[in-house]
UniProtKB/Swiss-Prot annotation:
Keywords: Activator, ATP-binding, DNA-binding, Nucleotide-binding, Transcription, Transcription regulation, Two-component regulatory system
Biological function: Required for induction of expression of the formate dehydrogenase H and hydrogenase-3 structural genes.
A single GO molecular function term of this UniProt record: ATP binding
UniProt DNA-binding region: 663-682
Species classification: Bacteria, Pseudomonadati, Pseudomonadota, Gammaproteobacteria, Enterobacterales
Keyword ATP-binding: yes
Stated name of the protein: Formate hydrogenlyase transcriptional activator
One BP annotation, GO: phosphorelay signal transduction system
Keyword Cell inner membrane on entry: no
Sigma-54 factor interaction domain segment(s): 381-610
InterPro entries: AAA+_ATPase, GAF, GAF-like_dom_sf, Homeodomain-like_sf, P-loop_NTPase, Sigma_54_int, Sigma_54_int_dom_ATP-bd_1, Sigma_54_int_dom_CS
Binding of ATP, residues: 409-416, 472-481
Chain ranges of the GAF domain: 202-344
A Pfam cross-reference name: Sigma54_activat
């Protein structure tokens, strides 16, 4: 049959019909408006729209009966295999009476969707050459439509096809928009909860944070994390109940695993969603929910916490409103459980690391105690000279306080031994002294090593690292070569000394620390302050109690003791049997300048032990000169005729106005090191201040 436009209505009539149908917001309204139009036009008593969903193979039906009753129905069986299926394969007008309809589609006729009628017509709904349903018209009298009436019905159908497609597109767009909004909101929730829980390394804090976030976003009032106990067949339960919105109740308990719903989830490793009744067989701690909410039916959702293939525990959610656990919410809760599992895994790992750390600390304390019992008060410090006696008296004086100590002295004078003695005599001796050489580490890594860093704080920071100040909490921190600390790092050290707090790199969280600082340097900090190479405020903080270590040349009476101690220690280490040291060897060694101090002396003795054959230490002069620089007074400023060393130094000091160091100082003019010149001045009884 060929169809032509409905010309007898005229353009205005066609426009009015189109406008009326286009104004309908949805398919049900469109069906109702269509029924009114065809009824007013005396074309039919009612009309309906049948849409075909190709993807789901379902049919949707919208109609308004003669009595005005709206009908909406959808299925994939009876309706989907009715007249709409025929029109999809044969896109021609389908018309029949009720008897023919009943014989062809008996199940549909018996469904009650179609009360008895006289005549039925279904015309295809098409858009862009694609049939997506049909538009049906029903007459109560058994009278077929004339050709002119079919023409009008077809015009109605064409308009309905355009409008129905627009409505479907609008609905689909709204659905897509709602879906995108829901996915966006879910993503925000997931990110917020992930950020909140992943930073928690304490199980109690983690559970509290998980509960707070889930309660906030899902209005769930009972949240628990259930973990297996180290005791067999036991469960540790960390629970939070929001009986009071502002004061949630936190509980921790250990229960038997047998017979619990949690046991079922541990075995199946699958989510469990269940409605509980008070009459159900429940574990005692599960029955507590009814004490909380009365005899209402409780809906429980138990989500497995998986780390790879390992089951860590169960996230247990309970609420007396079943609608909380919708399909969309369950999908999001599963994703949240995955993030919570990562946080639980991190927290358990942190617990284990903390336990091992505590054990190591205990073992270290025991070893420290043993070492303290073996060594004397001053450990390896050897010396009976007045200079060393004064140093050790200062050590005893300052050890019991928490004051910062600055140990000054040339390289090799034993600054670390003095620092260790101060620590061992202090109230902090129960913990290991932490030490660090500021000159032995690149400036870029020094801050991280001192204060620690968070994961991702800089390129290569793949894990959190604890700095020396944290390690030295309740103990002592020995900073050797503090004069080599970069200028830009000095304010941060000053802050720790003043406030006893600091921040790790990449973190804004303040960490409190209780550290006793012992610093050491072989540099002239006063001069560095004057040259703007060292902060004066940090210098004053460090210089609370300075201890000046004498160089070895200023305590020659200690050299024989040191030689003997080094000889026997090194010989024992090398498996040698040396029990005698010639007096001449001791006198020779005692007369040397030793610019490298005790360390240089120890190296010389070690070489002598290595070359000795027999049980008497053998040390020849070539051996000494090979390792000890010539310290004879070869000076840039030569002595005048009849002028001895004393007179030469006096004259040069007067010419330099008593200045010893620096490019215009006496040491430079004499070709000597500053320390060497000072040593000779002390030996000769020269006071530079009296000459200036």
């Amino acid at each position: 049959m060929s169809y032509t436009p409905m010309s007898d209505l005229g353009q205005q009539g066609l426009f009015d019909i189109t406008r009326t149908l286009l104004q309908q917001p949805d398919l049900a309204s469109l069906s109702e408006a269509l029924s009114q139009l065809v009824k007013r036009s005396a074309l039919a008593d009612s009309a309906g729209i049948v849409l075909w969903q190709a993807q789901s193979q379902r049919a949707q039906y919208y109609a308004t009966r003669e009595n005005g009753r709206p009908v909406e129905y959808e299925d994939e069986t009876v309706l989907a295999h009715g007249p709409v299926r025929r029109i999809l394969s044969r896109p021609d007008a389908l018309h029949c009476n009720f008897h023919e309809f009943t014989e062809t589609w008996p199940q549909l006729a018996a469904s009650g969707l179609y009360p008895e009628f006289g005549h039925y017509c279904l015309l295809p709904l098409a858009a862009e050459g694609r049939i997506f349903g049909g538009c049906e018209f029903i007459r109560q009298e058994d009278r077929p439509w004339s050709e002119k009436e079919y023409d009008r019905l077809h015009t109605f159908t064409q308009i309905v096809g355009v409008v129905a497609e627009q409505i479907q597109n609008r609905v689909n767009n709204n659905v897509d928009y709602d879906l995108l909004c829901r996915e966006r909101d879910n993503f925000r929730i997931l990110v917020a909860i992930t950020n909140a829980v992943l930073s928690r390394l304490d199980i109690d804090e983690l559970v509290s944070e998980v509960a707070k976030e889930i309660h906030h976003y899902f209005n769930i009032d009972a949240i628990s994390i259930v973990l297996r106990s180290h005791r067999k067949n036991k469960l540790n339960i960390y629970s939070t109940h929001y009986l009071d919105e502002h004061h949630p109740a936190h509980e921790q308990s250990e229960v038997d695993e047998a017979g619990t719903l949690t046991e079922r989830v541990f075995k199946s490793k699958e989510m469990l969603l269940i409605n509980l009744n008070e009459r159900d067989p429940l574990a005692p701690y599960e029955r507590m929910l009814f004490d909380t909410w009365g005899n209402q039916i409780q809906t429980l959702c138990l989500l497995p916490l998986m780390s790879g293939k390992t089951m860590l525990g169960v996230l247990k959610l309970a609420q007396c409103e079943e609608k909380v656990f919708t399909t969309a919410n369950l999908k999001l809760l599963r994703q949240i459980a995955e993030r919570v599992a990562i946080a639980v895994d991190n927290a358990l790992a942190y617990q284990e690391i903390h336990r091992l750390k505590e054990r190591l600390v205990d073992e270290n304390l025991a070893l420290t105690e043993q070492l303290n019992n073996v060594d004397s008060e001053f450990g390896e410090i050897i010396g009976r000279s007045e200079a060393m006696y004064n140093v050790l008296k200062q050590v005893e004086m300052v050890a019991q306080s928490d004051s910062t100590v600055l140990i000054l002295g040339e390289t090799g004078t034993g600054k670390e031994l003095i620092a260790r003695a101060i620590h061992n005599l202090s109230g902090r001796s129960g913990r290991r002294m932490v030490k660090m050489n500021c000159a032995a580490m690149p400036a870029g890594l020094l801050e991280s090593d001192l204060f620690g860093h968070e994961r991702g704080a800089f390129t290569g920071a793949s894990a959190q690292r604890i700095g020396r100040f944290e390690l030295a909490d309740k103990s002592s921190l020995f900073l050797d070569e503090v004069g080599d600390m970069p200028l830009e790092l000095q304010p941060k050290l000053l802050r720790v000394l003043q406030e006893q707090e600091f921040e790790r790199l990449g973190s804004n969280k303040l960490i409190q620390t209780d550290v006793r600082l012992i610093a050491a340097t072989n540099r002239d900090l006063k001069k560095m302050v004057a040259d703007r190479e060292f902060r004066n405020d940090l210098y004053y903080r460090l210089n609370v109690f300075p201890i000046q270590l004498p160089p070895l040349r200023e305590r020659p009476e200690d050299i024989p003791l040191l030689v003997k101690a080094f000889t026997f220690k090194i010989a024992r280490r090398m498996g040698r049997n040396i029990d005698s040291i010639p007096a001449e060897t001791l006198r020779t060694l005692s007369s040397m300048e030793w610019p490298g101090n005790v360390r240089e002396l120890e190296n010389v003795v070690e070489r002598a032990v290595l070359l000795t054959r027999g049980n008497v230490l053998q040390l020849s002069l070539p051996d000494i000169t090979a390792v000890t620089p010539d310290t004879s007074p070869v000076a840039t400023e030569s002595a005048k005729e009849g002028e001895d060393e004393y007179q030469l130094i006096i004259r040069v000091l007067k010419e330099t106005n008593g200045v010893v160091a620096g490019p215009k100082g006496a040491a430079q003019r004499l070709g000597l090191k500053r320390t060497t010149l000072l040593s000779r001045m002390k030996r000769l009884g020269i006071d530079k201040d009296a000459l200036a």
